[in-house]
């Protein structure tokens, strides 16, 4: 029996499926929805198209290992922080110009626990220091990864990978690099692919880097890699006019969602009424049928970009439930950052605001992790017209 059928074989799930399908038709044809309540479960599956739900592939990998939280390094660096804190308020002192990259990295995390982009350059400097005493770029990378660990939410690691690629003078192979023991001890293949995207952007033109990411057979890998490219070239990627829609329509289909994510994630994140702002973004920007789902994914990330509050997560979930076939993309965008930056209460609150398929997918995405390889079907759906 197909898994999609088995999921709805109980009366409870059948009722949830009816409710979800009728909600998507927005009660515009209530007689039809009312009649659907009398359909058999099998007929209902045909009408509502259960196979259209891009469920996560649980055979792909174990859920992504949650990287160390900033609190881990607060404890690990406790002695260093005590030595470098001011006596009045416990805030960090400035470091002398001669301070090592690692000391500056510790200071950055002391100042900003969820730092990231600031640490890219420090990762490059740490690799350069290690390269002076190592026999090869590969050995220097392994050593640099050991120094960076997951400080600044992986920013140092991403920078070290970029410097490694530059030292070799050739684009790294995603599968080969992400299988290195020094890498797998810190992050999984998904976040490693994102780091490779940073490296490709440093070595190649933006177009070639995105094509390199899109060449990955796994949709998730291509998506995360493209995010690294866009992030690395953020200052120039969207141009002076910042026409996000025009730009993201031109990139390879596998990279569209990453393009919209970085193009739209801050557009509505500071609004007082987040739901209204995201809805306005969808109306204004997500007007192309070709890129609609990818655009909705990017717009939805604004709900939880900065202040990741439980009530905002629930608001976002309720908004996602109004989007019909794009509901799945919206849920993925909403939950994308929560595994790394959100709380369990936030995840539970958002998913509890949904019903049926949407609630199940929400819980699966939240549990899988930010850079999970289980989301191939979900991410692949953004590349479809």
Question: What are these model-predicted stretches?
Answer:
Residues 21-25, 33, 48:
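Cysteine-centered motifs
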Residues 37-43:
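Sec-dependent signal peptide recognition
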Residues 8, 12, 16, 20-23, ...:
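Low-complexity, intrinsically disordered or signal/transmembrane-proximal segments
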Residues 16, 45-46:
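Short, linear, compositionally biased motifs with a strong N-terminal bias
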Residues 53-385:
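Non-catalytic tandem-repeat scaffold regions and their flanking low-complexity/translocation tails
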Residues 46-54:
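N-terminal signal peptide
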């Amino acid at each position: 029996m197909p898994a999609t059928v088995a999921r709805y074989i109980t009366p409870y799930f059948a009722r949830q499926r009816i409710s979800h399908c009728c909600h998507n038709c927005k009660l515009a044809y209530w007689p039809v929805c009312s009649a659907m309540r009398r359909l058999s479960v099998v007929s209902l599956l045909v009408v509502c198209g259960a196979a259209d739900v891009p469920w996560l592939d649980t055979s792909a990998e174990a859920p992504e290992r949650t990287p160390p939280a900033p609190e881990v390094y607060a404890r690990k660096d406790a002695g260093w922080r005590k030595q470098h804190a001011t006596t009045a308020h416990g805030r960090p002192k400035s470091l002398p110009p001669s301070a090592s990259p690692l000391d500056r990295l510790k200071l950055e995390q002391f100042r900003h626990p969820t730092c990231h982009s600031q640490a890219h350059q420090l990762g490059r400097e740490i690799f350069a220091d290690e390269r002076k005493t190592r026999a090869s770029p590969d050995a220097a990378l392994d050593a640099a990864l050991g120094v960076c660990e997951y400080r600044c939410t992986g920013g140092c690691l991403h920078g070290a990978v970029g410097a490694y690629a530059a030292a070799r003078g050739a684009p790294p192979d995603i599968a080969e690099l992400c299988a290195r023991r020094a890498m797998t001890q810190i992050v999984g293949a998904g976040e490693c692919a994102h780091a490779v995207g940073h490296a490709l952007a440093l070595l190649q033109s933006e177009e070639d880097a995105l094509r390199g990411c899109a060449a990955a057979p796994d949709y998730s890998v291509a998506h995360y890699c493209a995010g690294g490219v866009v992030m690395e070239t953020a200052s120039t990627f969207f141009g002076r006019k910042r026409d996000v829609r025009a730009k993201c329509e031109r990139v390879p289909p596998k990279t569209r969602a990453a393009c919209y994510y970085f193009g739209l994630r801050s557009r509505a994140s500071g609004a007082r009424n987040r739901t209204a702002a995201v809805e306005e973004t969808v109306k204004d920007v997500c007007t192309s049928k070709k890129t609609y789902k990818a655009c909705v994914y990017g717009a939805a990330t604004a709900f939880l970009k900065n202040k990741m509050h439980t009530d905002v997560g629930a608001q976002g979930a309720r908004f996602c439930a109004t989007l019909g076939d794009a509901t799945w993309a919206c849920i993925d965008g909403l939950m994308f950052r929560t595994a790394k930056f959100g709380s369990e209460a936030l995840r539970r609150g958002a998913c509890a605001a949904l019903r049926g398929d949407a609630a199940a997918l929400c819980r699966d995405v939240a549990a899988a992790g930010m850079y999970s390889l289980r989301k191939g079907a979900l991410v692949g759906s953004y590349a479809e017209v």
